[in-house]
Regions:
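Extended, polar beta-sheet/loop recognition surfaces of beta-rich domains
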Residues: 87, 98, 110-119, 131, ...
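A short tyrosine-centered beta-strand micro-motif
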Residues: 92, 177-179
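Bacterial N-terminal signal peptides
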Residues: 1-7
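Extended, well-structured beta-strand/loop surface patches
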Residues: 122-174, 182-210
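A glycine-anchored, Pro-Gly-centered beta-turn/N-cap motif
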Residues: 88, 173-176
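Extracellular-facing segments of soluble proteins and assemblies that are Gly/Ser/Thr-biased and enriched
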Residues: 66-148
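N-terminal signal peptide c-region/cleavage motif recognized by signal peptidases
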Residues: 7-13
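N-terminal segment immediately downstream of the Sec signal-peptide cleavage site
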Residues: 13-63
Length: 225
C-alpha cells in the first residue's frame, strides 16, 4: 500500500453533506476523555492493537458506544478488515503521542509539554472515508484533560499525558466502508519520533459478517514503538 502523504488540505466551509465527524460528547464523555480511554484500552490488552497486521485484533477489548480503531507504531503499513456492530461511534487516531512517568517523578505540566512537542509540527495529515477527504486535520487536535492514570482503577499506576490528532466518526451506515489515513510530523530540530509517519487503511463491514477476507491465525511479531 502506498504511503499516503500530502499537504494538509485547506478546510472548506461549503460542504453540502452533513459531516460524518463529531466533537460532541458521546455517552456523556468528552472527546478528550475518550482519547485517554483509548490509551488505557491499548495499554491493557495482551497484544498491542496498533500492531494488528490485518484486522484479526479488531474485536479486542471493545465495549461501550465507541469502537476503537488503531494506528501503528510507524514501522509498517497495514490494511485491516473488520466487522463493526451497527450503531457504534468510531474513534480513529490519526497521529499522536503519549508520555508517561516511568522511574523518575515528572510533573503533569512536563508530561504535557513532552506530548505536545511533535504535535506542534504536523507536516501532513489526510483521512479519507470512502475516498472522500474528511477536511483539515489541524482542526482535530485533541489533548488529554490534564494528566490521567493509565489504569483508572489504580491511583498509583503511571501518570500520563496525551496529545495528537483524532477523529470521532458518527455511526456509519450498514455496509462496506474504507478509512485511509496518512500523516507525518516534521519537527525541524529532530528528536524522538520527530519524523513519525502513519499510513494505514481499514475496510469496515458495518453490521454484517459477509465478504470479510479470511486471515491467518495469530498476530505477527512486530517491534513495539
Amino acid at each position: 500500500m502506498a504511503l499516503l502523504l500530502a499537504t494538509v488540505p485547506a478546510f472548506s466551509a461549503d460542504s453540502v453533506a452533513p459531516s460524518p465527524l463529531t466533537r460532541e460528547p458521546v455517552g456523556g464523555v468528552s472527546l478528550a476523555e475518550w482519547t485517554a480511554r483509548w490509551w488505557r484500552w491499548a495499554d491493557s490488552q495482551g497484544v498491542a492493537p496498533y500492531l494488528d497486521p490485518d484486522g484479526r485484533l479488531c474485536d479486542l477489548g471493545q465495549d461501550g458506544p465507541v469502537w476503537n480503531l488503531a494506528g501503528t507504531n510507524g514501522r509498517f503499513q497495514p490494511r485491516r478488515e473488520c466487522v463493526v456492530p451497527a450503531g457504534k461511534f468510531l474513534l480513529l487516531p490519526v497521529i499522536n503521542m503519549i508520555h508517561f512517568q516511568v522511574d523518575t517523578p515528572v510533573s503533569c505540566e512536563e508530561l504535557q509539554a513532552r506530548a505536545a512537542v511533535n504535535n506542534d509540527y504536523l507536516a501532513s495529515a489526510v483521512v479519507l472515508l470512502d475516498g472522500q477527504p474528511l477536511g483539515d486535520m489541524r482542526r482535530h487536535r485533541v489533548k488529554s484533560d490534564g494528566c490521567f492514570r493509565i489504569d483508572a482503577d489504580d491511583a498509583h499506576s503511571r501518570l500520563a499525558a496525551a496529545d495528537g490528532y483524532w477523529v470521532m466518526l458518527k455511526p456509519l451506515a450498514p455496509g462496506r466502508h474504507t478509512l485511509s489515513v496518512g500523516a507525518n510530523y516534521g519537527v525541524p530540530d529532530g528528536g524522538a519520533y520527530s519524523r513519525m509517519q502513519q499510513s494505514f487503511e481499514y475496510v469496515l463491514h458495518v453490521g454484517t459478517r459477509t465478504q470479510v477476507v479470511s486471515r491467518g491465525q495469530g498476530p505477527t511479531q512486530a517491534a513495539a514503538p
